[in-house]
Amino acid sequence: HHPQWQRAKAWLEAGEIGTLRHVDAAFTFHLTDLENIRNRPDAGGGSLRDIGVYTFGSARFVTASEPVDLSARLILENGVDTFAQVAGIMEGPHGRFTYGSMTSMRLYNRQVVTFQGDKGMIRVEGGPFNANVNDMAEVELHQNGNRVITERFPTANHYVLQVEAFGRSIREGVAYPCPLEFVKGTQAMMDTVYNVGVEISL
């Protein structure tokens, strides 16, 4: 619902970065309190369930693509994944491209998604998954080695926009931008990652 994602999607669809080749996403924060719901296996904790939905969903939304091959490496603590590194291939209207993501509940705060093409790059940062909380929401378009267009959204509140979009769907019959079917696709991607994930240790 946040306009930064709408802008990234529009730039990609307009061919601003040429042919899409790779998407990379990272979402991390530091949380060691084992009583926190995110660290409890009985409450469905884990970095993937808590924040992997964002790294998966953002790539799927902007590119309108689905994974066709996935692998994952997981670090487990107390029965939950505190670190997950996912790699794969996605396919959709922009063709096939590689995908990589990293989520962790044991690293310093970081949120960024990049969409790399053969002629440019789109970078969504400034805390894009909880925009304007950690930093100002912004999206960048990099082209020609030294040209950068930056758009910032200091006042956009994606929670308000979500409620407004829902209201329009009810009152006017306008299509909801993130329907249940889309959410099911993100859950399917997560299920696959857990099925193919390999536990590693440091």
Predicted feature locations:
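Contiguous beta-strand/loop segments that form the cofactor/metal-binding neighborhood of enzyme cores
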Residues: 56-131, 160-175, 191
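Predominantly a Rossmann-like dinucleotide-binding segment in NAD(P)-dependent oxidoreductases
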Residues: 2-71
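Short polybasic amphipathic segments
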Residues: 113, 131-144
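A short glycine-threonine-serine/GTX helix/turn-capping micro-motif
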Residues: 43-49, 149-157
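Residue-level signal for the nucleotide or nucleotide-sugar donor/cofactor binding architecture
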Residues: 3, 161, 178
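Short alpha-helical
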Residues: 2-3, 158, 185
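Short coil/turn segments
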Residues: 28, 127-129, 154-158
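C-terminal helix-rich "cap/oligomerization" subdomain common to oxidoreductases
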Residues: 151, 165-202
